[in-house]
Amino acid sequence: MMLKPSIDTLLDKVPSKYSLVILEAKRAHELEAGAPATQGFKSEKSTLRALEEIESGNVTIHLDPEGKREAVRRRIEEEKRRKEEEEKKIKEQIAKEKEDGEKI
């Protein structure tokens, strides 16, 4: 009986079999906890679903964890800045509408 996805295919996606086991376990836990899936699945079990995601390349290991943390920090800061700019524009629009309403 051939397992799908095959171990050889999966080992092409990660640096070692130990990394594969850790990545698969973490992703399976995330899926069980309700994390959104990155694709449709053939399998019912979360462990096999995690392996399908690894095989497709949708889930990967970050070999530079500090770099990942920095990227997440930058993304959060960028989102915060965008929200602040949007709130500022909304407040300016409200103030302008009030001004226009008082002129009439």
UniProtKB/Swiss-Prot annotation:
GO terms for biological process: DNA-templated transcription. GO terms for cellular component: DNA-directed RNA polymerase complex. Residues 76-104 are annotated as: Disordered. It is an enzyme of class 2 (transferase). Keywords: DNA-directed RNA polymerase, Nucleotidyltransferase, Transcription, Transferase. The keyword Transferase applies. It catalyses: RNA(n) + a ribonucleoside 5'-triphosphate = RNA(n+1) + diphosphate. InterPro entries: DNA-dir_RNA_pol_omega, Pol_omega/Rpo6/RPB6, RPB6/omega-like_sf. Its EC number is 2.7.7.6. Pfam families: RNA_pol_Rpb6 (PF01192). GO terms for molecular function: DNA binding; DNA-directed RNA polymerase activity. SMART domains: RNA_pol_Rpb6. The RNAP catalytic core consists of 2 alpha, 1 beta, 1 beta' and 1 omega subunit. When a sigma factor is associated with the core the holoenzyme is formed, which can initiate transcription. Promotes RNA polymerase assembly. Latches the N- and C-terminal regions of the beta' subunit thereby facilitating its interaction with the beta and alpha subunits. NCBIfam families: rpoZ. Belongs to the RNA polymerase subunit omega family. This is DNA-directed RNA polymerase subunit omega. The gene is rpoZ.
